[in-house]
UniProtKB/Swiss-Prot annotation:
Belongs to the uracil-DNA glycosylase (UDG) superfamily. UNG family. HAMAP family: UDG. It comes from the Bacteria. The gene is ung. GO terms for cellular component: cytoplasm. This is Uracil-DNA glycosylase. It catalyses: Hydrolyzes single-stranded DNA or mismatched double-stranded DNA and polynucleotides, releasing free uracil. Excises uracil residues from the DNA which can arise as a result of misincorporation of dUMP residues by DNA polymerase or due to deamination of cytosine. InterPro entries: UDG_fam1, Ura-DNA_Glyclase_AS, Uracil-DNA_glycosylase-like, Uracil-DNA_glycosylase-like_sf. The active site is at 70 (proton acceptor). One of its GO terms (biological process) is base-excision repair, AP site formation via deaminated base removal. It is an enzyme of class 3 (hydrolase). Keywords: Cytoplasm, DNA damage, DNA repair, Hydrolase. It comes from Pseudomonas fluorescens (strain SBW25). Its EC number is 3.2.2.27.
Amino acid sequence: MTEDDRIKLEPSWKHALRDQFEQPYMAQLREFLRQEHAAGKEIYPPGPLIFNALNSTPLDKVKVVILGQDPYHGPGQAHGLCFSVQPGVPAPPSLVNIYKELKRDLNIDIPNHGYLQSWADQGVLMLNTTMTVERANANAHAGKGWQFFTDRIIEVVSEHQPHLVFLLWGAHAQGKQKLIDATKHLVLTSVHPSPLSAYRGFLGCGHFSRTNKFLEQNGETPINWVLPPA
């Protein structure tokens, strides 16, 4: 069995990203994570959920891409989808502001949970550009190699799909614009939904209705942003 065979990854992504698992950065990233585990550090999300964004949204099903920075670093929060938390965990402040904008934009009632899996299941690729984090230590895994992998994911989906919407909230996400073919995709930008910045343009951005309008104009089914009970 090769190393590649042991990677639990949805087949379309596994094929599209196959060469990345042979790159030197990936070996270095694997060794870094092994050493962190050996040192007794708690890593989020749990191993089987690290690739949840890819496993939930196959490459040819992607309609929308939302970019986050790194996973939530509190116990029980992260499950591999940016901005989302596991059932039973209160919605973090940035997600609360996302809900506020959904209410303003589409009159969607604010849910009592923060589990966004249904968006991923409909074709929203919810990708953190750094895919792991150490407990209680935000950005601890930034610069360790994930950035090369997730940059390639952005390039692949931009190349592969005909009419996507990219939602780039905050300076970090907007730094990835160079990877996106803006001649065929809709790229929507705003400040981050964090309480520190949301009032400077995220609240009022209308990104959710604009996303669905673009999808419908291009013959795609719009996203149902209403979340089912978790």
